[in-house]
């Protein structure tokens, strides 16, 4: 996969983020390094390794699912969103 200006523009649009022009070259280099690293994983022979679902013997310990409301944190996060309304993020429609 080639990391070029077209890919960066697509990622900017999908993420609703904007990358400064002076940072784009560094970002392209970093993304290319990440992709090359991940592509190296395709060369690893795992045919003799048994599949596992957890690294913890006996399964993953569960915790009670409890909700917490922190209005100060919520407001802080929403203040940094490009668009928000009534405590929710407003995002562009992507599915017709």
Swiss-Prot record:
Keywords: ATP-binding, Ligase, Nucleotide-binding, Protein biosynthesis. It catalyses: L-glutamyl-tRNA(Gln) + L-glutamine + ATP + H2O = L-glutaminyl-tRNA(Gln) + L-glutamate + ADP + phosphate + H(+); L-aspartyl-tRNA(Asn) + L-glutamine + ATP + H2O = L-asparaginyl-tRNA(Asn) + L-glutamate + ADP + phosphate + 2 H(+). GO terms for molecular function: asparaginyl-tRNA synthase (glutamine-hydrolyzing) activity; ATP binding; glutaminyl-tRNA synthase (glutamine-hydrolyzing) activity. It holds the Pfam family GatC. Its EC number is 6.3.5.-. One of its GO terms (biological process) is regulation of translational fidelity. The keyword Metal-binding does not apply. Belongs to the GatC family. Allows the formation of correctly charged Asn-tRNA(Asn) or Gln-tRNA(Gln) through the transamidation of misacylated Asp-tRNA(Asn) or Glu-tRNA(Gln) in organisms which lack either or both of asparaginyl-tRNA or glutaminyl-tRNA synthetases. The reaction takes place in the presence of glutamine and ATP through an activated phospho-Asp-tRNA(Asn) or phospho-Glu-tRNA(Gln). PANTHER family: GLUTAMYL-TRNA(GLN) AMIDOTRANSFERASE SUBUNIT C, MITOCHONDRIAL. NCBIfam families: gatC (TIGR00135). This is Aspartyl/glutamyl-tRNA(Asn/Gln) amidotransferase subunit C. It comes from Aliarcobacter butzleri (strain RM4018) (Arcobacter butzleri). The lineage of its organism: Bacteria, Pseudomonadati, Campylobacterota, Epsilonproteobacteria, Campylobacterales.
């Amino acid at each position: 996969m080639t990391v070029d200006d077209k890919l960066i523009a697509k990622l900017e649009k999908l993420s609703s983020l904007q990358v400064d022009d002076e940072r784009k070259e560094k970002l392209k280099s970093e993304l290319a390094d990440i992709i090359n690293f991940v592509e190296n994983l395709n060369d690893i022979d795992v045919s003799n390794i048994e599949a596992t679902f957890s690294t913890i013997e006996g399964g993953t310990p569960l915790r009670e699912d409890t909700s917490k409301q922190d209005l100060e944190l919520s407001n802080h996060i929403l203040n940094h969103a490009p668009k928000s309304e009534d405590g929710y993020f407003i995002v562009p429609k992507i599915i017709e």
